[in-house]
Amino acid sequence: MWIFELLYFVYFFVRLRLETGLYTKEEYKKLLTIRARKLSKRYNMKIYVHGKPQPGFLAANHTSYLDPVVVIALKAGGAVSKIEVKDYLLFGPIAKKVGMLWVKRENKKSRTGVINQLNQWNAAKDPLWIFPEGTTSTYGDLDPFKMGVFKAAENTGHMIQPLVFCYDNPLVDWGRTGKEKDLFTSIIDFYKDNIRTNVYCFWMEPMKVGPGEAQMKADELHKKMLIYIKRFERPRDE
């Protein structure tokens, strides 16, 4: 029954929450990667990977509530996330442990504060995931990029390491039906509907952003990522 799988999911995160005080930050990141891979295997979510990551800001497209599991299974790190996640019972403390930058998307001061933190972030030593769209895109598409990570790469000199990943099941897109769902509703639907998917991940060439190149590089990366998404993000029976 799906309820037992849902209970396992809750147990999975309760255990991770209780372990936040038992490990160093780096040890905990390694633990997260191991656990994310086990969770993916349990739900028969096969992750196919091409290429290897290089040091830098980790920039990935954002389609689904499954995205955090996928990126952590590949490379655990901190992330930029909306402030609401900080108050989630289990997710907040786990996110804080790995290093999170919180942003109030509707608050200009908050966005500016995050940009200032990004400008001081050592992305080569402390991996940080950023979804440049700032929100989830529709399955098979890619919303315009915000400039935060590109400006940070320009100001710090750190590379951007792009990752594009594509699902072969449109049901992973929580806005697919036209009704925006919250995280917990999406998780419940994942189990009730027995949603299964494969994920095709491509580590792209690292990107250097020179002075005054932020917008140009953002447009360039968006164009390249969209080619992958149009080619690989489609139902498996097509």
What are these regions (language model features)?
Residues 121-150:
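Catalytic-site beta-strand/loop segments enriched in glycine and acidic/polar residues
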Residues 1-62, 70:
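Membrane-anchoring hydrophobic helices of lipid-metabolizing enzymes
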Residues 140-213:
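A cross-family acyltransferase "interaction/gating" segment
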Residues 196, 200-238:
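Long, non-transmembrane cytosolic or organellar matrix-exposed soluble domains/tails
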Residues 11-18, 54-108:
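Catalytic core of membrane glycerolipid acyltransferases/transacylases, capturing the structured
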Residues 49, 58, 79, 201-203:
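Generic preference for hydrophobic
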Residues 101-122:
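A membrane-cytosol interface segment of integral membrane proteins
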